[in-house]
Amino acid sequence: MIIEQVVGNIDNISDEILNKLHLENVFVESSNLVKKVQRVVTDHGREIGICLNGQKDLSPGDILYMDERDIIVLNVIPDDLLVIRPSSLRQMGDIAHKIGNRHIPAQFDEIEMLVQYDYLVEELLKQLEVPYTRENKKVKLAFRHVGHSHG
């Protein structure tokens, strides 16, 4: 089976409809959310090729296939993350600057900064006494490495 476009997102499907369908899941690493071409296998052993044409990145809950009997949904494997919770705006700016200088991709929400686990970043957080935890957590976006130059 080749998937060329996402049908929708499971968050927009009613429980009434979902309860009538045979659900299969595809589990991918968050880094694969940006891949337009990939081969995956559902939790029921069905092999699927994904070949998206110019579409936005994949998202957790995307419906890869749906008919009157079956639905195949994309899920993300939890990442090993450092969840950083600075105690002040100054501390947030300082740690964000230091992590940015190391070119480490980060994601933010209202009160947390998320980076993929790195023992050197963990040592930096300990040294600067920045509150953090190490957690396995699902992210909605891939961590993107952004190319740049200093010249």
Swiss-Prot record:
The main location is cytoplasm
Q: Which SUPFAM superfamilies match?
A: Urease metallochaperone UreE, C-terminal domain, Urease metallochaperone UreE, N-terminal domain
Q: Which GO terms describe its biological process?
A: protein folding; protein-containing complex assembly; urea metabolic process
Q: Name one GO molecular function term.
A: nickel cation binding
Query: According to its UniProt record, what is one Pfam family this protein matches?
Result: UreE_N
Identify the CDD domains for this entry.
UreE
Renumbered to this chain, the signal peptide range is: none
What keywords tag this UniProt record?
Chaperone, Cytoplasm, Nickel, Nickel insertion
Which SMART domains does this one have? UreE_N
Q: What is one term from the GO cellular component aspect held by the record?
A: cytoplasm
Where in or outside the cell it occurs: the entry states: Cytoplasm
Under NCBIfam families, the record lists: PRK13261.2-1 (NF009755)
What does the protein in this record do? Answer: Involved in urease metallocenter assembly. Binds nickel. Probably functions as a nickel donor during metallocenter assembly.
Q: Family assignment? A: Belongs to the UreE family.
What this protein is called in its record is Urease accessory protein UreE
